[in-house]
Structure formats: C-alpha cells, structure tokens
C-alpha cells in the first residue's frame, strides 16, 4: 500500500539520514527500484515527472502499475508515489489518480502567487492524507521540460513557504538537474545552513542528486536534507548496460532479441545504482526501525 512521505522523512530528518526519490520511467524502472528498496529494507519514494507520467499514458496507469507491483512483489517497506515538479493542474490530476505525495513547483511564479497556490494545495493534500513538497529558488538544468538556472534560494522566502504547512521543502542551493558542468561551483552549504536555521524540523529536499560528490551529499544530510532526488544516474546506468548488451552482439544470439532479455542488464544496472545510493544516503535497514 502506498504511504505519504511524511513519516519516512520526519524519521530521516531526526535520524540524520536521507530517503532517496528515484524517478520512474516505465515498468523496468519501477520494478528495479522497488526490489532494491525491499532488498536493503529501505523506505523509498518513486518520483514521476509530468513528462514521464505522459509517457506512461497517464497518472492512473502509473498508480495501477505501482499498486499492482507492491502486491505482486510482496513489497513490505514504505513506498510513496510522488509527483515531481508538478504544475498546479498536474497536482490536481495526481490527487485524483491516487498518488500519495505531490510536489508543487511554483518557483517560476512571483513569491506571492507561489504562496497562494501552495497554501491551497496544502489544504487539499492534507485533507487526503498526502504529503506535499514545495520549491523555492529554481533548481538548475532541465527536468521534465522545467528549466531552471541553479540559483540559491532566499532563506526568508523558504521560511514563509515552510510555514504554510508543507511536508518538505526543496530549496535551490546551487544544485542542478542532469550532469554537472566542469565549472560547477558546488553546493552552497552556507545557504543550506541558513535555511535549516529558519525552517527547524522541516525535512529539506536536494534535487539533482546525480553527480554531487559523496562528501557533499553527506554534508547536506548533516545540514537537514532528508530527501535526495536521483534520476540521471539511473538513466545513464541503464543506457550503458543496454548499449553493452547490443555491442556484444547478445541480441543476435538465440532469442537475445526478446525485450525481456534485452532490457534485463539495464534493469539490473538501475537496481545496483539504487542500492548504492540507498547505502550512501544512510537509509538501509531504516524500514524496520
């Protein structure tokens, strides 16, 4: 059964570890992430961008697939299904479809409008027992068609959004989606620390987890980050393993062209990547505590 992300993130914040949000794109992605979480006894958040939701034919399809897998695979760790970088309209669609968590990305609105819309969605989400994430300061790079520069959020604006009753807060601290350029200046821990001082127990979210050095990830967790989003690294691992299978001519051997065989190395690579991240974030074994 899907759960809100609230309890798992509050526990993570108090226990100084982070729960991974791993974005799903299809059946293989979903299965690999769920199996990795079950194997490591870690809570997990399945992220769905609006683009991925559309690709999978709609949010109801996603909910049906995820709920079916939780049952068929006997998944016993806490799993939240979360809309990633949701538009105002997208949030309502996911609430209706049966998601257990949403993110409203109002970072491109003026702060007053962002606050107004967030306030409204907080009320609706809470009424349905769902968790809700808000964002202040855009995250750089591109995610599901949403493009951001990678700025640092204003800690005071973060506090005003946190005070609206959101479950978790994503704040730009110089992080970007996708691969980090060589001239990237790194995360602004000064900004993160200032945000944590003002937002207290609020679980903070780090978007663009791919390519951030491990020591920076650990430092971010020590400064209140309780949810870390990973997408690009899983995509790269999948692509590399699939390319190797084809380049090695495996698809030409026997029934190697069968999609179940052709996609298996990529699915295994995703699972391995998720296990590595779960261990790095410190959430291994936390489902049983």
Where are the model-predicted features located?
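Glycine-rich nucleotide/cofactor/substrate-binding loop typically near the N-terminus or early
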Residues: 81-83, 240, 249
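Active-site proximal loops enriched in glycine and acidic residues that flank catalytic Cys/His/Asp
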Residues: 173, 208-210, 232
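Hydrophobic alpha-helical scaffolding
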Residues: 23, 151, 228, 232, ...
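Metal-dependent phosphohydrolase cores
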Residues: 21, 213, 259
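Extended, intrinsically disordered, low-complexity segments
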Residues: 246-289
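Alpha/beta enzyme core
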Residues: 3-11, 15, 27-52, 57-76, ...
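Short catalytic-loop micro-motif centered on adjacent basic/acidic residues
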Residues: 19-23, 81-82, 103, 204-207, ...
């Amino acid at each position: 059964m899907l759960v809100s992300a609230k309890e798992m993130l509050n526990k993570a914040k108090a226990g100084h570890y982070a729960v991974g949000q791993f974005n799903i794109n299809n059946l293989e992605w979903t299965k690999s992430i769920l199996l990795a979480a079950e194997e490591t006894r870690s809570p997990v958040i399945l992220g769905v961008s609006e683009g991925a939701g559309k690709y999978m034919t709609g949010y109801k399809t996603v909910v049906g697939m995820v709920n079916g897998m939780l049952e068929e695979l006997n998944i016993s760790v806490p799993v939240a299904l979360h809309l990633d970088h949701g538009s105002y309209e997208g949030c309502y669609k996911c609430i209706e479809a049966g998601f257990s968590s949403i993110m409203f990305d109002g970072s491109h609105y003026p702060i007053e409008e962002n606050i107004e819309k967030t306030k409204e969605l907080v009320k609706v989400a809470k009424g349905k027992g769902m968790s809700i994430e808000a964002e202040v300061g855009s995250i750089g790079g591109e995610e599901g068609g949403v493009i951001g520069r990678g700025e640092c959020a204003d800690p005071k604006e973060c506090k005003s959004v946190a005070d609206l009753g959101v479950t978790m807060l994503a704040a730009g601290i110089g992080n970007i989606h996708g691969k980090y350029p060589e001239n990237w200046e790194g995360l602004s821990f000064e900004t993160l620390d200032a945000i944590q001082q003002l937002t207290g127990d609020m679980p903070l979210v780090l978007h663009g987890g791919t390519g951030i050095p491990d020591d920076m990830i650990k430092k971010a967790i020590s400064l209140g980050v309780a949810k870390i989003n990973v997408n690009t690294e899983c995509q790269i691992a999948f692509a590399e393993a699939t390319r190797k299978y084809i380049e090695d001519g495996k698809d030409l051997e026997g029934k190697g062209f069968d999609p179940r065989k052709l996609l298996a190395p990529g699915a295994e690579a995703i699972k391995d990547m998720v296990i590595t991240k779960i261990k790095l974030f410190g959430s291994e074994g936390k489902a049983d505590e």
